[in-house]
Amino acid sequence: MKPIVFLLSGLCVLILLVPTILVLPFQAEKGAAVNREPGHKTAHTIRETKGAEPTLKESPVSVPVYRTSNHSVENIPLEEYVIGVVASEMPVEFKPEALKAQALAARTFIVRLMVANSASRPRKGSLVDDTQMFQVYKSKSQLKKEWGSDYAQNLKKITNAVAGTQGKILTYENKPIEASFFSTSNGYTENAEAYWTSAIPYLKSVKSPWDKKSPKYLATRTFSVPEFQQKLGVQLAGQDTVGQITARTPGHQVATAVINGKKLKGRDIREKLGLRSADFEWKRNGGTITITTKGFGHGVGMSQYGANYMAEQGKSVTDIVKHYYQGVDISEADSFLSKYMAKK
């Protein structure tokens, strides 16, 4: 009889202990998640919305935009402004994740201007104009004329991309970044200091091999010798030579070239000749000079075609922006918008 009593007692103790043993590891895990160091910053990502479409919420602020067509300032709700920029700056045929990346860049660009101590304003009462001097913006009526019968489906696609990133911007060390972008790289993006004047830690050269599939990857321009000399302010030596490319940048663009003893920057050559990029090769054939370029744009920041090809391979908007903008976070724009409203 006693053995049975002991057996029953042991079973009772075991029944009481098992739930406690099972629960303890989960309590420890919850505690570890809660007890973070003070000031810990969680990096945000953009969640993919499968099935249900995101809803575009009312914008907390408006952007005063100088409309060059009628010479007036129009106050456009922030997210509506981003829609007009994405629709104008990136082909609507691009993949949704690429359009989201463009929306993040566009929103970051304007929020950065909002909180800047000094900004180049096109007209009194405006923050930006609607040209490429800032960001190209088109209204819905303009887009309707441009898209015709495709207007409804195109607008829906762009709106979904903007809604999927609404309220989010790109930051570095808790500040909105210089979210520069361009059409097509030569296979690499460019260091900021190689094209502009100052180094920017998140704008560093990265590989972008997908761009070789872009329809804008290669281009050719032909100049007469007199035209070439006049545009660059040089005199060519000999009958068959042009000059020597003497240095290239980290992004494989021309840094410097020498033409008959005169040293020129690759960027200056590009701009004076109206070339698509500063990655070029030249060849003289009698009285003409043929220049072949790789890529389209300054090369600093996000390649739009590269972003689209990444999206085609299944990469997310987070993957895209963190590839082209090194070390950035995806952050809420609210605190920056509050500062802007306080300044007003």
UniProtKB/Swiss-Prot annotation:
Statement: the UniProt record of this protein carries the keyword Hydrolase: no
Annotated spans, Disordered: 35-59
Domain of life, per lineage: Bacteria
Biased composition (Basic and acidic residues): 37-51
Keyword Mitochondrion: no
Keyword tags: Sporulation
GO biological process terms on file: sporulation resulting in formation of a cellular spore
Coiled coil: none
An example Gene Ontology CC term for this record: outer membrane-bounded periplasmic space
Signal sequence range: none
Function: May act at the level of sigma-G activity or its stability. SpoIID is probably required for engulfment.
PANTHER family to which the protein is assigned, alphabetical: AMIDASE ENHANCER, N-ACETYLMURAMOYL-L-ALANINE AMIDASE-RELATED
The protein, known as: Stage II sporulation protein D
Source species of the chain: Bacillus amyloliquefaciens (Bacillus velezensis)
